[in-house]
From Swiss-Prot:
May play a role in copper homeostasis. Can bind one Cu(1+) per subunit. GO terms for cellular component: cytoplasm; cytosol; nucleolus; nucleoplasm; nucleus. The gene is CUTC. This is Copper homeostasis protein cutC homolog. The lineage of its organism: Eukaryota, Metazoa, Chordata, Craniata, Vertebrata. It is found in: Cytoplasm; Nucleus. Belongs to the CutC family. It comes from the Eukaryota. Its main location: cytoplasm. HAMAP family: CutC (MF_00795). InterPro entries: CutC-like, CutC-like_dom_sf. Changing residue 77 to L: In a breast cancer sample; somatic mutation. Ubiquitous. Homotetramer.
């Protein structure tokens, strides 16, 4: 498939899937839920995209249409979220079939990597399910997402992910944000000893990125870097909401902010280069 719309502001060779230590000393992953946000992330200097839908729910599987157009629009690697719904990470047999089908389709439409996670009812990594999904993902690299933050024993869970063959784990340190979970993130990185990438994520902004990177020793980080912009709609029916909450207006849109991505990029370069 021929790619179109490559960023004119930052032309570069395609980056490998994501071993820690990119050519510029760090790796920034931006989670996005639209083509516009994907393009903005690349323009701002992101090294990799995590493509999702439903970011307000923590990220769910995007449509294959979005994936197809994103792949036509950016040159940086696109890792695709495989999560059939919001909520917990304990999946039914039918949900598992959906996840398997989505992995196959994501590979067909050009995903550079996959992102998923699954737990047992007692808060352990679901080894059997993960092995089954990993077999379908091969040879693509796989990230275990923030289901990790819901595990019973994070240190033991990290070793489990290593044995299963995950390339990285995304975590807020089992806390409300990466800043709050910084002590555990540091311990996880020390335990990993480079065998698996421990990638901080959750509430990362220009105000706390330096502290998180310096305090953890991480060489990759995950952020959304979004801003809210007003809808272009002129006629507005403010008494109707499409979602469950009136706090989420149909007339304000959250998109990745090029300036925010550039700022985070500059902070990380200053620390790690």
């Amino acid at each position: 498939m021929k790619r179109q719309g490559a960023s004119s502001e930052r032309k570069r060779a395609r980056i490998p899937s994501g071993k820690a230590g990119a050519a510029n000393g760090f790796l920034m992953e931006v989670c996005v839920d639209s083509v516009e946000s994907a393009v903005n992330a690349e323009r701002g200097g992101a090294d990799r995209i995590e493509l999702c839908s439903g970011l307000s729910e923590g990220g769910t599987t995007p449509s294959m249409g979005v994936l197809q157009v994103v792949k036509q629009s950016v040159q940086i690697p696109v890792f695709v979220m495989i999560r059939p719904r919001g909520g917990d990470f304990l999946y039914s047999d039918r949900e598992i079939e959906v996840m398997k089908a989505d992995i196959r389709l994501a590979k067909l439409y050009g995903a550079d990597g996959l992102v998923f996670g699954a737990l047992t009812e007692d808060g352990h990594i679901d080894k059997e399910l993960c092995m089954s999904l990993m077999a379908i993902c091969r040879p693509l690299p796989v990230t275990f997402h923030r289901a990790f933050d819901m595990v019973h024993d994070p240190m033991a869970a990290l070793e489990t992910l290593l044995t299963l063959g995950f390339e990285r784990v995304l975590t807020s340190g089992c806390d409300s944000s990466a800043l709050e979970g910084l002590p555990l993130i540091k311990r996880l990185i020390e335990q990993a000893k480079g065998r698996i990438v421990v990638m901080p994520g959750g509430g990362i902004t220009d105000r706390n990125l330096q502290r998180i990177l310096e305090g953890s020793g991480a060489t990759e980080f995950h952020c959304s870097a979004r801003s809210t912009r007003d809808s272009g709609m002129k006629f507005r029916n403010s008494s109707v909401a499409m979602g469950a909450s009136l706090s989420c207006s149909e007339y304000s849109l959250k998109v990745t902010d090029v300036t925010k991505v550039r700022t985070l990029n500059a902070i990380a370069k200053n620390i790690l280069v």
